[in-house]
């Protein structure tokens, strides 16, 4: 597997391409980060974009991350995933307002820009009239995506307490280990299929879920995020070697992935 050692001053960024696969890779700095992206075999064969998104940016002791799963039944779900993923990565690196109310307000404010950009994605001219009408109806209802985003600020010898902040809507997986014991139960009942973000209305199905806690110095932790294309990981609690995760991404047992898959794992 590809390994990236710590870059100058601990800077590292990865943003997935929805038009290509990215085999499982590892970055090692203050965090150990494993990341990957794969399209469903159907999308790959037809040359279509994937509808998932994963992005991570590290700068020394801090890490910002986003994972999105575009809603296929909405109009251009890949657009919502890409737009929201990039927008949240920027926001995480600049905001000083971490309250639930501030985040919910931000998620509503960005719909104007998203809707304006979505209007530029007109259905291709060669599609049949009936299909064009269906696509235009979908376009008026907006593009939607599920998401998980967050920021980690590591504790240090001088600053003994760090923190992790996360927000999400939807049923993508969010799993958390503290000192090798999984403590993900808090998140399970809030990972709801009917919740997502829309370019038209912002949060759908309720307000975003926001979680924040302190991080203790010297306590090993692991955070794992993935979309439902990798649901084979659901029952697995132990730390898997790279080769086994890549097998799940290659999915030889089903002739390729049945759904798009984005994967991000952080250890510190």
Task: Describe the predicted segments one by one.
Residues 1-8, 125-135, 199-268:
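C-terminal catalytic subdomain
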Residues 2-92, 172, 205-208, 212-213:
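N-terminal entry segment of metal-dependent catalytic domains or homologous docking segments
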Residues 101-178, 206-217:
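Catalytic core of PPM/PP2C metal-dependent serine/threonine phosphatase domains
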Residues 47-58, 139-165, 187-227, 231-235:
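Acidic loop->beta-strand submotif enriched in PP2C/PPM serine/threonine phosphatases
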Residues 65-69, 167-169, 224-226:
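Short hydrophobic beta-strand that contains or immediately precedes a catalytic carboxylate
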Residues 86-126, 235-259:
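Helix-loop-helix
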Residues 176-185, 189:
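A short, surface-exposed interaction/processing loop segment used at functional sites
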């Amino acid at each position: 597997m590809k390994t990236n050692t710590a870059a100058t001053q601990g800077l590292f960024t990865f943003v997935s391409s929805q038009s290509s696969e990215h085999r499982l890779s590892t970055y090692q700095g203050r965090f150990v980060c494993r990341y990957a992206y794969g399209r469903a075999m159907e999308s790959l064969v037809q040359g279509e974009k994937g509808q998932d998104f994963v992005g991570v940016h590290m700068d020394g002791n801090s890490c910002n991350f986003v994972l999105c799963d575009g809603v296929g039944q909405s109009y251009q779900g890949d657009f919502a995933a890409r737009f929201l993923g990039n927008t949240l990565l920027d926001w995480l690196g600049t905001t000083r307002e971490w309250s639930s109310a501030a985040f919910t307000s931000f998620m509503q404010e960005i719909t104007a820009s998203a809707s304006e950009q979505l209007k530029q994605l007109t259905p291709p001219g060669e599609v049949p009239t009936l299909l064009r009408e269906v696509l235009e109806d979908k376009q008026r209802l907006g593009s939607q995506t599920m998401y998980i985003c967050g920021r980690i600020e590591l504790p240090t010898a001088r600053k003994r307490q760090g923190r992790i902040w996360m927000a999400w809507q939807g049923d993508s997986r969010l799993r958390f280990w503290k000192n090798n014991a999984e403590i993900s139960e808090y998140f399970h009942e809030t990972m709801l299929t009917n919740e997502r973000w829309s370019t038209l209305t912002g949060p759908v199905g309720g307000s975003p879920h926001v979680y924040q806690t302190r991080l203790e110095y010297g306590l090993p932790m692991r955070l794992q995020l993935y979309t439902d294309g990798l649901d084979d990981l659901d029952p697995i609690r132990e730390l898997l070697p790279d080769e086994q995760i890549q097998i799940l991404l290659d999915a030889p047992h089903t002739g390729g992935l049945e759904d798009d898959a984005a994967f991000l794992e952080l250890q510190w």
